[in-house]
Amino acid sequence: MATLPILDLWSTNKALVSLTISASLLLVSLLVSLFQVGRRERGLPPGPPTRLVLGNEHEIPKADSHFLMSKWAKQYGGIFSLKRFRNTTIVLTDWKIMKELVDKKSTNFSHRPPSKVADLITRGNHILMMQYGETWRTMRKLIHQYLMESQCEKEHWKVQEAEAAQMLHDFLVDPENHMKHPKRYSNSITMSLVFGIRAKSVNDEYMTRLYSLMEKWSLVLETGATPPVDSWPLLQWIPERFMGYWRRRATEVGDLMTGLYTEVLHVIENRRKAGIYKDSLMDRVLDKKDKYRFDEHQLAFLGGTLMEGGSDTSSSLILAIVQAMTQYPEVQKKAHAEIDSVIGTDRSPAWSDFRKLPYINMMIKEAHRWRPVLPLGVVHGLATDDSYNGMHLPKHSTVILNVWGMHMDPDRFENPDAFIPERYANFPELAPHYAALADGAARDHFGYGAGRRICPGIHLAERNLFIAVAKLLWAFEFKNNPAGKNDASAETGSSQGFMHCVKDYDAIVTVRGEERRQTILRELEQAQTVFAKYD
């Protein structure tokens, strides 16, 4: 009996030893696992050296990361990888690789990576950020059917030319507000077609709220602007004051977005209750509301997403072209000469003049290349494991389309920082033609994205740009104002965020003669019959 305490002691010690060994093994396992975090796994595309746990996260700037991505592409090639804690990011900066992966393997590359910030803002209902699935396909089909090329050729050009007529008048009578007129033009086209509502002036409430919202949305979504809560979920629980108030910023943008888009939807619904129906996209959707079975938030974001896409991209490129005219007068002179050889002073250019004005088309393509609205595109996500040229591309990787790096490649574009429309002398067609070619190197630019996520409004946007630029250069001469500000630098002259637009600049706007002035006034009067459908 005296030996029992000894046995009890041994039994207790044995349990403690076992527990200690188990805890030690667990600790070693955790340490080994931790030491793997941030490391580039064997088989991944090459990339910059990583740090323990962080990977490359510490190197990614909060703004303008496309410059660093392009620098890395020169060092590591057209496909390279980054580690952001546990997550892998694949960066594509090669025209052919882009085609081989994003276009030809579009089923795998059409997803979006998980985004806590995007979900907080949109609840998953923004088609730009929406996961690839049935709802996305339904919305995409609706947009495509309404904005397809045949619809643009048959109907939409009338609204575009009428709104361009007002834009010319706005430039004529209010040249000091030249930064706002292209925004009203593109916004009003979109509002008319999507909702049956015009933006009559640069002070339109919905337009003003939208562009303010887009600035905030763009800043929140820029690569590097938000703590990597998707890569390291534990960061969600750190007090926001130590993390740049990321959740608060996202929630504020989401509230503004939901408020605006829902308000516009209610205007349409109330109009229909009053017995007023218009041939807008949202009217068509509401006609078949039971078929599509969208909830209110989805309906609001379907229209709101189109309001965004149709307003911001076209106006940003028009403003970039006008700025280029103040910096490259020889280009403007060539454009004037081409227009004057085809169009007189008794009418402004129309969409039907497209084939007669190839230099204008070259200018638009060069603007896409020179000042892309989305320098890093919109991130894609890999659904399953994939590979390229022996390199492993793991599922759930984030895929960045480095549009800036491709557009500024000196091996493809001599003197890439300069605005030289002649680069596109052998590209007479519109952008959709080149996006559909099997050879990725034959594409004109990546301004509209790639794969199944390519901009569904591409046909409308191409016509927006041609009509606006041709009419503006027919009507006006744009000169640099030496007494004002005009920063045309790629590094400092554009806004920050995932969407870029040139910063406000001063310009001298001069109408090209009295006959053109009278034509502008007359064509605005003629446009009233089109406006009457939407007022």
UniProtKB/Swiss-Prot annotation:
Uses: Terreic acid is a metabolite with antibiotic properties. Terreic acid also acts as a selective inhibitor of human Bruton's tyrosine kinase in mast cells and other immune cells.
Names of the cofactor(s): heme
Sequence similarity: Belongs to the cytochrome P450 family.
Native source organism of the sequence: Aspergillus terreus (strain NIH 2624 / FGSC A1156)
Chain coiled-coil ranges: none
SUPFAM superfamilies membership: Cytochrome P450
PANTHER family in alphabetical order: CYTOCHROME P450 MONOOXYGENASE ALNH-RELATED, P450, PUTATIVE (EUROFUNG)-RELATED-RELATED
Name under which the protein is recorded: Cytochrome P450 monooxygenase atE
Pathway participation: Secondary metabolite biosynthesis
Annotated positions binding heme: C455
CDD domains: CYP64-like
EC number: 1.14.-.-
An annotated Gene Ontology molecular function: monooxygenase activity
Pfam families, per database record: p450 (PF00067)
Reported phenotype of the disruption mutant: Abolishes the production of terreic acid, but accumulates (2Z,4E)-2-methyl-2,4-hexadienedioic acid, a degradation product of 3-methylcatechol.
Keyword terms: Heme, Iron, Metal-binding, Monooxygenase, Oxidoreductase
Record InterPro entries: Cyt_P450, Cyt_P450_E_grp-I, Cyt_P450_sf, Cytochrome_P450_fung
Keyword Heme: yes
Function, in words: Cytochrome P450 monooxygenase; part of the gene cluster that mediates the biosynthesis of terreic acid, a quinone epoxide inhibitor of Bruton's tyrosine kinase. The first step of the pathway is the synthesis of 6-methylsalicylic acid (6-MSA) by the 6-methylsalicylic acid synthase atX. In the biosynthesis of 6-MSA, atX utilizes one acetyl-CoA and three malonyl-CoAs as its substrates and catalyzes a series of programmed reactions including Claisen condensation, reduction, aldol cyclization, and the hydrolytic cleavage that yields 6-MSA.
Catalytic activity reported: 3-methylcatechol + AH2 + O2 = 3-methylbenzene-1,2,4-triol + A + H2O
Entry keyword annotation includes Ribonucleoprotein: no
